């Protein structure tokens, strides 16, 4: 299977004034495309069982990848997986509600407390990386962060955390520097205006419906 750049499903300016069109275009058509190209190059010559895996499945099985290819696929299949989720997680005008809101209030105490923890994880991630809302194996919600293009699906030994990612925020400078320069906290605050809570809730509900550990 050859990876391809996913369509956004919306115009590059659809998230204005919160996320600017120029950044969105460069981020999607240049940065994400580079991860796709580099991942495809790294897949060449690998056994079919690895090549045919979906990216999220592949990065969950990094130990099965030959050592000489592992780093390239950790970075680039990771980048492809992360960005593919990121684009789907963005939309103006949705509302956090229903079972997901209830679970956030249960596990963080309040929506504001969740947002504060998420913002801290995103703001304090040194260098490049991601902040995540994940569903743990115990059926609880948690906030974690990863370096570079690591993903919680990679597991604790690789990424330093684990869980099923429901929502991720890219805090690489390429995600915000044209508009926000060094003001990462401002970018993080604007993120709440463009979270596609409908998508995140659907992801949460599908995962809990098929999980024996769901509470």
Swiss-Prot record:
EC number(s) stated in the UniProt entry for this protein: 1.15.1.1
Keywords carried by this UniProt record: Manganese, Metal-binding, Oxidoreductase
Any GO MF annotation of the entry: superoxide dismutase activity
Top EC class of this enzyme: oxidoreductase
UniProt: Mn(2+) binding residues: 27, 83, 170, 174
Signal peptide bounds: none
Functional description taken from the UniProt entry: Destroys superoxide anion radicals which are normally produced within the cells and which are toxic to biological systems.
PANTHER family: 37S RIBOSOMAL PROTEIN S26, MITOCHONDRIAL, SMALL RIBOSOMAL SUBUNIT PROTEIN MS42
Subunit structure: Homodimer.
Name listed for the protein in its UniProt record: Superoxide dismutase [Mn]
Gene name for this UniProt entry: sodA
């Amino acid at each position: 299977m050859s990876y391809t750049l996913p369509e956004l499903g919306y115009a590059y300016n659809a998230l204005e004034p919160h996320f600017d069109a120029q950044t969105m275009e460069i981020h999607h058509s240049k940065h994400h495309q580079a991860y796709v190209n580099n991942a495809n190059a790294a897949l060449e010559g690998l056994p079919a069982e690895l090549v045919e895996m979906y990216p999220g499945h592949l990065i969950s099985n990094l130990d099965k990848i030959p050592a000489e290819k592992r780093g390239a696929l950790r970075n680039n299949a990771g980048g492809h997986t992360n960005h593919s989720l990121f684009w789907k997680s963005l939309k103006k005008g949705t509302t956090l509600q229903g079972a997901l809101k209830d679970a956030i209030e249960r596990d963080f105490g309040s929506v504001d407390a969740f947002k504060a923890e998420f913002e801290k994880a995103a703001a304090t991630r040194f260098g490049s990386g991601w902040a995540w809302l994940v569903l743990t194996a115990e059926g609880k919600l948690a906030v974690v962060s990863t370096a570079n293009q690591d993903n919680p699906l990679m597991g604790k030994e690789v990424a330093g955390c684990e869980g099923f990612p429901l929502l991720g925020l890219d805090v690489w400078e390429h995600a915000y520097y044209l508009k926000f320069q060094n003001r990462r906290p401002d970018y993080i605050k604007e993120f709440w205006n463009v979270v596609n809570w409908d998508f995140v809730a659907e992801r949460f509900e599908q995962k809990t419906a098929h999980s024996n550990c769901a509470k």
